[in-house]
């Protein structure tokens, strides 16, 4: 536990020019109510981290979402999840949030409400744990709340459905493929051919080359023009157009991870579009600019708590596994390089992870 005379730490924080930097005088988060203080052992860089620039940057707010670490201190109301000091945990927090500026993953210490924490089994390292949070939280929100897919992991649907995950080699993609298989469904996916074996190892029943001009026809044939659900992990206008074209004649549901194109949505009224923002699963206010602003949502927090409980059971039973990693040296000092590599699209089929400290 940090000494109470120690109230500052090293952390990656926002700057006044819309960028970020490593500071050595950031405050350690205060612990109250159901919050838990965690000594960070590893962090991973996610696409959302690379997008928080300009108006999405709050000066001096701590950045970062995905982390793993050791429980250092429990708030007085953190009594419902069986956590104790010394437990190995991982999850995601909302970094660069004006409504909660002292909390972010890219720091020596972070803090989270107890019910969003995943307990790491002995078989999973801190580095692997740092890849789990935002991917599995976002996938659960997208699949089982936004799309409303029947069944749940540990409670499989009675009738398997063929479901498309566009971008299956992404971290959200591999998480979604596993969750769909555990929910009793038949996941198919698109990715580059060099990632076919990867996505199949995570549960894809079949994989299609998104660059092949015949892929849309192949998927329509594969699904007998009856595809009802599509999760778009790439979330561009072109990926949305692809998903809209392969959803079956009777229509269905489409969910992306970024705001979708209203113009594409107008092309098929029988398809119901939605988009989700993974950090909103915590139910807290996220004070980013529109359209990413989220008010406090207790109903969403309840879903988040229930979903985290499911993930904890899946981890305990070793039914889900982490995304592949690129482990990099340098800790917090090298976060900027990871962000730049993501922006330059230099990373495919792996998540950048930085171990911190000893």
UniProtKB/Swiss-Prot annotation:
Monomer. It comes from the Eukaryota. It comes from Talaromyces variabilis. Pfam families: ADH_N, ADH_zinc_N. Trans-enoyl reductase; part of the gene cluster that mediates the biosynthesis of varicidin A, an antifungal natural product containing a cis-octahydrodecalin core. The PKS module of pvhA together with the enoylreductase pvhC catalyze the formation of the polyketide unit which is then conjugated to L-isoleucine by the condensation domain of the NRPS module. Activity of the Dieckmann cyclase domain (RED) of pvhA results in release of an acyclic tetramate. The cytochrome P450 monooxygenase pvhE then catalyzes the oxidation of the C21 methyl group to a to carboxylate group. It is an enzyme of class 1 (oxidoreductase). Keywords: NADP, Nucleotide-binding, Oxidoreductase. The keyword NADP applies. This is Trans-enoyl reductase pvhC. Substrate binds at residues 134-141, 278-282. NADP(+) binds at residues 48-51, 169-172, 192-195, 210, 257-258, 347-348.
